[in-house]
Amino acid sequence: MKIAVLLGGISRERPISLKSGENVLKALKKLGHDVVPIDVDENFLEIAPKLKEFEVVFNALHGHFGEDGTVQAILDWVGVSYTGSKVLASAICFDKVMTYRVLDGYVNFPEYTIVKKPVKESPYGFPCVIKPRKEGSSIGVHICDNSNQLYNDLSEELKKYNEMMIQRYIEGRELTVSILEIGKPQILPVLELKPKRRFYDYTAKYVSGMTEFILPAPLSVEEYQKVANSSLRAFELCGCEGFARVDGILKDNVFYVLELNTIPGLTDLSDMPASAKAAGMSFEELVDAIIQTAVR
């Protein structure tokens, strides 16, 4: 099969996308496919029509432009099959506020408010969490313990973003749930994350040895059902397709969804490949399964 792999991109997650894309390229070549890498830049719209010559496009982009529905809209315009969720689901899941609006009343998530200028008070007390409304890889996320830290961190981040979220801090077990459509959406073994830092931030995600993976997460039957049901519900409500990852916190038998990732990382340290491995899937088998979701 002739497959194009989109990688790199123009977001702050470019370094991670390059790693994901390189791993996907290697896997597809091992599987015997004719593979062409495409490093996406601002001129993507000009070259996009050439993608018609490919049977499938594997989208390994992360962050703005590649994961927010923009590239998906271009690929739909070209008329080529591609991996992952389509335009609407991608746009919803990349915008945490829109994600929560869709999930409201169906799935638990931490309370939040939006600010467009620095403030010193949190509606939820301290510690609290601040994060960009639209961003990935925990970029721009801070846990603030007092008024001064809240004000200073917001001041810094609002130089980069038009608005920020202040969210209730929930101290619990960090879980990530990888979902793969094999006929229907199925949950891979739930992964519990134990970062050596305060939370699963950019460094904990991408520096080897900074996070302990516990697979499968030790959950009671009741806990597993709540985590699984909430994750599948979120996947379906947001209209996700192919594959995705649901990140959340388990506390007092309640699973709080933090976000949905429509293009999960596929680096050597990423969560979804680890969960797939725990399910008995090699990385090549995972990539092949993702490709199959695009050609069905």
From Swiss-Prot:
Which Gene3D superfamilies does the protein's record reference?
Answer: 3.40.50.20, ATP-grasp fold, A domain, ATP-grasp fold, B domain
What this protein needs as a cofactor is: Mg(2+); Mn(2+)
Subcellular location as annotated? Cytoplasm
GO terms for MF? ATP binding; D-alanine-D-alanine ligase activity; metal ion binding
- List ligand-binding residues for ATP: 125-176
Any GO BP annotation: cell wall organization
Q: What class of enzyme is it?
A: ligase
Entry keyword annotation includes Lyase? no
Q: Give the residues the record marks as binding Mg(2+) 2.
A: 259, 261
Provide the residue positions that the database annotates as binding Mg(2+) 1: 247, 259
**Domain ATP-grasp: residue ranges:** 99-292
One matching Pfam family = Dala_Dala_lig_N
Which catalytic reaction applies to this protein? 2 D-alanine + ATP = D-alanyl-D-alanine + ADP + phosphate + H(+)
User: What EC number(s) is this enzyme filed under?
Assistant: 6.3.2.4
Q: In which pathway does it act?
A: Cell wall biogenesis; peptidoglycan biosynthesis
Query: What does the record note about the cofactor?
Result: Binds 2 magnesium or manganese ions per subunit.
Please report which protein family the annotation says this sequence is part of. Answer: Belongs to the D-alanine--D-alanine ligase family.
Q: What does this protein do?
A: Cell wall formation.
Recorded protein name is D-alanine--D-alanine ligase
Write down the species: Pseudothermotoga lettingae (strain ATCC BAA-301 / DSM 14385 / NBRC 107922 / TMO) (Thermotoga lettingae)
